[in-house]
Amino acid sequence: MGSHRTLAVTFAFASLVGVSTLAQAPPYGIGRTPTPEEIRALDISIGPTGEELPPGKGTVKEGGQLYRAKGCASCHGAAGIGGSAPNLKSKDPKNPDVWARGRILPLRAPFATTVWDYINRGMPLNQEGTLTPNEVYSITAYLLFINDVVPEDTV
């Protein structure tokens, strides 16, 4: 019986020492704390009217060129479908239920401003924030065009 009690006390002590050691483990040291300016640049909300968007413009034609040049096609497929990343073109763009489901693309995006904001904040993957507002406007126009939301001459 004494050896069981000794074993239990030893185990309890080791557990407490182990937990306190883990609690004081140094941080991993990955990344850095963002500056106030960096936080302020991302701390925006984009509503459906687009009032909060920066000035800029883009065309469907420019968007198609940028879609290929910036590497969008390498993940999402040459025509916005069939890549390793989510499809950006509806398989049935004429389906009226696309709007009813709250989407203008196969992604969950109820407004064109949502598409703009997502691209601006999150694309290209691992190079987020590298697109200019005009590039984002152009790529957004291209995606809306390939989904039959806007005509090709949209600016």
Task: Write out the residue ranges for each language-model feature.
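Bacterial N-terminal signal peptides that target proteins for export
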Residues: 1-9
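Sec/Tat signal peptide C-region and signal peptidase I cleavage site
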Residues: 19-24
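Electrostatic cytochrome c docking/interface patches
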Residues: 29-68, 124-128
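C-terminal capping alpha-helices of c-type cytochrome domains
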Residues: 38, 117, 129-153
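Stable alpha-helical elements in mature extracytoplasmic
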Residues: 38, 59, 71, 111, ...
